Curated annotation (Swiss-Prot):
Monomer. It catalyses: alpha-L-arabinopyanose + NAD(+) = L-arabinono-1,4-lactone + NADH + H(+); alpha-L-arabinopyanose + NADP(+) = L-arabinono-1,4-lactone + NADPH + H(+); D-galactose + NAD(+) = D-galactono-1,4-lactone + NADH + H(+); D-galactose + NADP(+) = D-galactono-1,5-lactone + NADPH + H(+). Keywords: Arabinose catabolism, Carbohydrate metabolism, NAD, NADP, Oxidoreductase. This is L-arabinose 1-dehydrogenase (NAD(P)(+)). The active site is at residue 91. InterPro entries: Gfo/Idh/MocA-like_OxRdtase_N, Gfo/Idh/MocA_oxidrdct_glycsds, NAD(P)-bd_dom_sf. Catalyzes the NAD(P)(+)-dependent conversion of L-arabinose to L-arabino-gamma-lactone. Is involved in a degradation pathway of L-arabinose that allows A.brasilense to grow on L-arabinose as a sole carbon source. Prefers NADP(+) to NAD(+) as electron acceptor. Displays high catalytic efficiency for both L-arabinose and D-galactose in vitro. However, the enzyme appears to be involved in the metabolism of L-arabinose but not D-galactose in vivo. SUPFAM superfamilies: NAD(P)-binding Rossmann-fold domains. NADP(+) binds at residues 15, 37-38, 169. Disulfide bonds: none annotated. The keyword Oxidoreductase applies.
Length: 309
C-alpha cells in the first residue's frame, strides 16, 4: 500500500455529505475512489448500489468508511474486513456491544485497522479539558445535551427503531466527551428512559452515574428542546467549574474563556485513521456505547405521548 490510502465511503446520507466527504477531500493521506449508496451518488468517483458490489469491483481498495445506520454496520464491517480492507466506523460503532467485540477480534486476526470513531472527542475543547482535569479534585459533573429532533433528524425513521438509540444518538456524543476528559471510569447507578408510545427508542433520558471514587455524574438528554440547542458539560472542581459548551466548541475555566483552536472534528478523525493504518493499529473504545447499553438494560421506562411522523 502506498502512503496515500484508497478509500471507499458507504452510506451517502447527510452526515457523509456534510462531514465525511469534505474531511476526506482535505486529508492528503486519502484518495476517495468509490462510494456505495442505495439512493445517492458522488460525482468524480465510481458509484455502486451496495458494499458487496463495491468490494467485488474495487479489488485494490485499501479501506472503507461506513456511514450507514448502526443496524446494518456489523454486516458491512465484517464483509469489508473479510475482504481485507481497513474499516472506519461512524458512531456508534455498532447496534450491540457483542457486534463490536467480534469485529475487533476479526480485525486483529486479519492484521487490519478497525477505528471506532467518536467525532465529539475531536472537538476543540476536549483535550484542553482533559489535561486540566487530570490534576484536579472533581466534585460533580452535570451534562445537559438537548436539541429538537425534528430539526436535526427530519424523516430519519431508523433512529426510532431497535438499535437506533433514540435520544442517545446525540447523547452518546456527550458520553464520548465525558469518558475522555474524566480521569476515572464511570458506572451507571440509575437511569430513566422516556419513550413515546409509538416508537421503540427514548425521546429523553436521565442517567445518574458515579466514577470509581464516588463522584456523581448526571446526564440529561432531551429531543424535545428548542429552539436553541443545549450541548453543555459542567465539571465542578475545587479550583472552579470547567464548562464545555456548543458541543465542545467552547471552553471556560472558573468563569474565564479559554482560547481554542479551529473546529476540525472530522478532519482529525481521518488524520487519525490514516495514522492508525500506517502503524498497523486499531482504536476501539466502547465505553460510551456501554453506558448507553447499561441504560437500556438497567433503566426505568416511562411512556409518554406518541411522537407522530
Amino acid at each position: 500500500m502506498s502512503d496515500q490510502v484508497s478509500l471507499g465511503v458507504v452510506g451517502i446520507g447527510k452526515i457523509a455529505r456534510d462531514q465525511h466527504l469534505p474531511a476526506i477531500d482535505a486529508e492528503p493521506g486519502f484518495k476517495l475512489t468509490a462510494c456505495a449508496s442505495r439512493h445517492a451518488e458522488v460525482t468524480g468517483v465510481r458509484n455502486y448500489r451496495d458494499l458487496r458490489a463495491l468490494l467485488a469491483a474495487e479489488r485494490e481498495l485499501d479501506a472503507v468508511s461506513l456511514c450507514a445506520p448502526p443496524q446494518v454496520r456489523y454486516a458491512q464491517a465484517r464483509a469489508a474486513l473479510e475482504a481485507g480492507k481497513h474499516v472506519m466506523l461512524e458512531k456508534p460503532p455498532g447496534a450491540t456491544l457483542g457486534e463490536v467485540a467480534v469485529l475487533e477480534a476479526l480485525a486483529r486476526e486479519r492484521g487490519l485497522t478497525l477505528f471506532a470513531t467518536w467525532h465529539s472527542r475531536c472537538a476543540s475543547a476536549v483535550e484542553p479539558a482533559r489535561e486540566w482535569l487530570a490534576t484536579r479534585a472533581i466534585r460533580a459533573v452535570q451534562v445537559r445535551w438537548k436539541e429538537d429532533v425534528r430539526r436535526w433528524h427530519p424523516g430519519q425513521q431508523w433512529i426510532w427503531e431497535p438499535g437506533g438509540l433514540g435520544v442517545f444518538d446525540p447523547g452518546i456524543n456527550a458520553l464520548s466527551i465525558v469518558t475522555r476528559i474524566l480521569p476515572r471510569e464511570l458506572v451507571l447507578r440509575e437511569a430513566t428512559l422516556i419513550v413515546p408510545s409509538d416508537v421503540q427508542t427514548p425521546i429523553a433520558a436521565e442517567l445518574d452515574c458515579a466514577d470509581t471514587d464516588g463522584v456523581p455524574v448526571r446526564a440529561e438528554f432531551d429531543w424535545r428542546h428548542g429552539p436553541v440547542e443545549q450541548w453543555e458539560i459542567a465539571v465542578d472542581t475545587a479550583d472552579g467549574v470547567l464548562a464545555i459548551s456548543r458541543g465542545g466548541a467552547q471552553l471556560s475555566i472558573a468563569g474565564e474563556p479559554v482560547e481554542l483552536g479551529p473546529e476540525r472534528e472530522y478532519p482529525a478523525l481521518y488524520a487519525h485513521f490514516h495514522a492508525l493504518i500506517a502503524r498497523g493499529e486499531s482504536d476501539v473504545d466502547v465505553r460510551p456505547l456501554r453506558l448507553v447499553a447499561d441504560a437500556f438494560l438497567f433503566g426505568r421506562r416511562v411512556q409518554t405521548d406518541a411522537f407522530g411522523r
